[in-house]
Amino acid sequence: MEAQRAFGFLFICVSIAVGSASTISEIAYLNGAALYYHAAIWVGSFGLVFGAATPIFRKVAPAIRGRMKASTKWPMGTKALNGVCWAGPFVAIAALPEFYQYLILLGIGLGNLSTYSLIKRYSGNDNREQLIVGALSLASLPVALAMDTSIFAMNPDIAVMLSRILIAVSYAAGGAHALIEVKRRRQSS
Protein backbone atom coordinates (compact mmCIF):
# COMPACT_ATOMS: atom_id res chain seq x y z
CA MET A 1 0.00 0.00 0.00
CA GLU A 2 2.91 2.37 0.76
CA ALA A 3 4.42 1.79 -2.71
CA GLN A 4 1.07 2.53 -4.32
CA ARG A 5 0.79 5.78 -2.37
CA ALA A 6 4.37 6.68 -3.31
CA PHE A 7 3.78 6.05 -7.01
CA GLY A 8 0.48 7.90 -6.87
CA PHE A 9 2.28 10.93 -5.48
CA LEU A 10 5.10 10.56 -8.03
CA PHE A 11 2.61 10.37 -10.92
CA ILE A 12 0.74 13.45 -9.68
CA CYS A 13 4.04 15.37 -9.52
CA VAL A 14 4.95 14.26 -13.06
CA SER A 15 1.51 15.37 -14.23
CA ILE A 16 1.84 18.81 -12.65
CA ALA A 17 5.35 19.29 -14.06
CA VAL A 18 4.43 18.17 -17.59
CA GLY A 19 1.20 20.17 -17.64
CA SER A 20 2.76 23.37 -16.36
CA ALA A 21 5.88 23.07 -18.56
CA SER A 22 3.70 22.43 -21.63
CA THR A 23 1.57 25.48 -20.98
CA ILE A 24 4.45 27.81 -20.10
CA SER A 25 6.48 26.54 -23.06
CA GLU A 26 3.58 27.28 -25.41
CA ILE A 27 3.29 30.81 -24.02
CA ALA A 28 7.03 31.27 -24.54
CA TYR A 29 6.72 29.98 -28.12
CA LEU A 30 3.86 32.36 -28.89
CA ASN A 31 5.98 35.24 -27.58
CA GLY A 32 8.95 34.28 -29.77
CA ALA A 33 11.22 33.06 -26.98
CA ALA A 34 14.53 31.52 -28.00
CA LEU A 35 14.76 27.73 -28.05
CA TYR A 36 16.98 27.53 -24.96
CA TYR A 37 14.17 29.08 -22.90
CA HIS A 38 12.08 25.98 -23.54
CA ALA A 39 14.75 23.75 -22.01
CA ALA A 40 14.95 26.08 -19.01
CA ILE A 41 11.15 26.00 -18.68
CA TRP A 42 11.07 22.19 -18.67
CA VAL A 43 13.99 21.79 -16.27
CA GLY A 44 12.59 24.56 -14.08
CA SER A 45 9.08 23.07 -14.00
CA PHE A 46 10.33 19.65 -12.96
CA GLY A 47 12.81 21.23 -10.54
CA LEU A 48 10.15 23.36 -8.86
CA VAL A 49 7.59 20.58 -8.57
CA PHE A 50 10.00 17.93 -7.35
CA GLY A 51 11.92 20.44 -5.22
CA ALA A 52 8.71 21.46 -3.47
CA ALA A 53 7.86 17.79 -2.99
CA THR A 54 11.29 16.80 -1.61
CA PRO A 55 10.11 16.41 2.01
CA ILE A 56 7.43 13.97 0.92
CA PHE A 57 9.76 12.16 -1.49
CA ARG A 58 12.23 11.57 1.32
CA LYS A 59 9.51 9.66 3.15
CA VAL A 60 8.26 7.66 0.16
CA ALA A 61 11.60 7.01 -1.59
CA PRO A 62 12.13 3.60 0.08
CA ALA A 63 8.76 2.39 -1.24
CA ILE A 64 9.61 3.58 -4.77
CA ARG A 65 13.06 1.94 -4.59
CA GLY A 66 11.49 -1.27 -3.31
CA ARG A 67 9.14 -1.54 -6.25
CA MET A 68 11.92 -0.75 -8.71
CA LYS A 69 14.30 -3.28 -7.13
CA ALA A 70 11.82 -6.05 -7.86
CA SER A 71 12.59 -5.67 -11.56
CA THR A 72 16.28 -6.41 -10.99
CA LYS A 73 15.33 -10.03 -10.29
CA TRP A 74 13.61 -10.51 -13.64
CA PRO A 75 15.25 -12.72 -16.29
CA MET A 76 17.62 -10.84 -18.63
CA GLY A 77 15.30 -11.26 -21.64
CA THR A 78 12.42 -9.81 -19.67
CA LYS A 79 14.50 -6.81 -18.61
CA ALA A 80 15.54 -6.30 -22.24
CA LEU A 81 11.92 -6.45 -23.43
CA ASN A 82 10.85 -3.91 -20.82
CA GLY A 83 13.78 -1.68 -21.75
CA VAL A 84 12.88 -1.82 -25.44
CA CYS A 85 9.25 -0.95 -24.63
CA TRP A 86 10.41 2.11 -22.69
CA ALA A 87 13.40 3.23 -24.74
CA GLY A 88 12.54 2.06 -28.26
CA PRO A 89 10.05 4.81 -29.10
CA PHE A 90 12.29 7.47 -27.54
CA VAL A 91 15.31 6.27 -29.54
CA ALA A 92 13.15 6.33 -32.68
CA ILE A 93 12.70 10.09 -32.20
CA ALA A 94 16.24 10.56 -33.55
CA ALA A 95 15.23 8.91 -36.85
CA LEU A 96 11.67 10.25 -36.97
CA PRO A 97 11.68 13.67 -35.26
CA GLU A 98 8.51 14.78 -37.03
CA PHE A 99 6.61 12.10 -35.07
CA TYR A 100 8.11 12.84 -31.67
CA GLN A 101 4.86 13.69 -29.89
CA TYR A 102 3.40 10.33 -30.97
CA LEU A 103 6.58 8.44 -30.10
CA ILE A 104 6.60 9.96 -26.62
CA LEU A 105 3.00 8.82 -26.06
CA LEU A 106 3.93 5.40 -27.45
CA GLY A 107 6.99 5.10 -25.19
CA ILE A 108 5.08 6.08 -22.07
CA GLY A 109 2.20 3.80 -23.02
CA LEU A 110 4.26 0.73 -23.92
CA GLY A 111 6.68 1.27 -21.06
CA ASN A 112 4.00 1.51 -18.39
CA LEU A 113 1.97 -1.37 -19.83
CA SER A 114 4.98 -3.67 -20.09
CA THR A 115 6.13 -2.79 -16.57
CA TYR A 116 2.62 -3.34 -15.22
CA SER A 117 2.35 -6.74 -16.95
CA LEU A 118 5.80 -7.89 -15.87
CA ILE A 119 5.41 -6.78 -12.25
CA LYS A 120 2.07 -8.58 -12.13
CA ARG A 121 3.62 -11.72 -13.61
CA TYR A 122 6.79 -11.84 -11.53
CA SER A 123 5.71 -10.18 -8.27
CA GLY A 124 1.96 -10.75 -8.29
CA ASN A 125 1.33 -7.04 -7.63
CA ASP A 126 -1.53 -5.33 -9.43
CA ASN A 127 -0.23 -1.77 -9.88
CA ARG A 128 -3.25 -0.45 -11.71
CA GLU A 129 -2.00 3.12 -11.63
CA GLN A 130 0.69 2.05 -14.09
CA LEU A 131 -1.87 0.24 -16.22
CA ILE A 132 -4.00 3.40 -16.31
CA VAL A 133 -1.08 5.63 -17.36
CA GLY A 134 -0.07 3.18 -20.09
CA ALA A 135 -3.56 2.57 -21.42
CA LEU A 136 -4.49 6.26 -21.47
CA SER A 137 -1.21 7.18 -23.17
CA LEU A 138 -1.83 4.63 -25.92
CA ALA A 139 -5.48 5.67 -26.21
CA SER A 140 -4.27 9.27 -26.61
CA LEU A 141 -2.36 8.42 -29.80
CA PRO A 142 -5.38 8.64 -32.15
CA VAL A 143 -6.58 11.76 -30.33
CA ALA A 144 -3.17 13.41 -30.80
CA LEU A 145 -3.10 12.35 -34.45
CA ALA A 146 -6.58 13.77 -35.04
CA MET A 147 -5.61 17.06 -33.40
CA ASP A 148 -2.41 17.27 -35.41
CA THR A 149 -3.94 16.45 -38.79
CA SER A 150 -7.28 18.21 -38.64
CA ILE A 151 -8.29 20.49 -35.84
CA PHE A 152 -4.91 22.17 -35.31
CA ALA A 153 -3.24 21.53 -38.68
CA MET A 154 -2.57 25.24 -39.06
CA ASN A 155 -1.18 25.51 -35.50
CA PRO A 156 1.08 22.47 -34.97
CA ASP A 157 2.54 24.02 -31.81
CA ILE A 158 -0.87 23.78 -30.15
CA ALA A 159 -1.23 20.16 -31.25
CA VAL A 160 2.15 19.35 -29.68
CA MET A 161 1.18 21.16 -26.47
CA LEU A 162 -2.11 19.25 -26.32
CA SER A 163 -0.35 15.91 -26.82
CA ARG A 164 1.82 16.82 -23.83
CA ILE A 165 -1.30 17.73 -21.87
CA LEU A 166 -2.64 14.25 -22.71
CA ILE A 167 0.50 12.82 -21.09
CA ALA A 168 -0.15 14.96 -18.02
CA VAL A 169 -3.76 13.75 -17.90
CA SER A 170 -2.61 10.12 -18.16
CA TYR A 171 -0.24 10.53 -15.22
CA ALA A 172 -2.83 12.48 -13.23
CA ALA A 173 -5.41 9.73 -13.74
CA GLY A 174 -2.96 7.01 -12.69
CA GLY A 175 -1.79 9.00 -9.68
CA ALA A 176 -5.32 9.88 -8.59
CA HIS A 177 -6.39 6.24 -8.89
CA ALA A 178 -3.48 5.13 -6.69
CA LEU A 179 -4.16 7.73 -3.99
CA ILE A 180 -7.91 7.08 -3.99
CA GLU A 181 -7.32 3.32 -3.80
CA VAL A 182 -4.94 3.73 -0.83
CA LYS A 183 -7.47 5.95 0.96
CA ARG A 184 -10.28 3.45 0.26
CA ARG A 185 -8.23 0.57 1.66
CA ARG A 186 -7.33 2.50 4.79
CA GLN A 187 -10.96 3.38 5.44
CA SER A 188 -12.10 -0.21 4.99
CA SER A 189 -9.52 -1.64 7.40
Question: Which sequence ranges carry the predicted segments?
Answer:
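Helical transmembrane-bundle signal
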Residues: 15-22, 46-51, 86-89, 108, ...
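Alpha-helical transmembrane segments of polytopic membrane proteins
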Residues: 10-11, 38-47, 78, 102-108, ...
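Selected alpha-helical membrane-embedding segments in polytopic membrane proteins
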Residues: 9-94
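Membrane-proximal helix-loop-helix units in multi-pass membrane proteins
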Residues: 74-136
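N-terminal juxtamembrane cytosolic/stromal segments of multi-pass membrane proteins
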Residues: 1-9
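Terminal transmembrane helical module of multi-pass membrane proteins
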Residues: 118-189
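Structural signature of transmembrane alpha-helix termini at the membrane-water interface
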Residues: 23-27, 52-56, 91-94, 110-121, ...
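Membrane-helix interface and helix-disruption motif detector
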Residues: 27-42, 91-105, 147-163
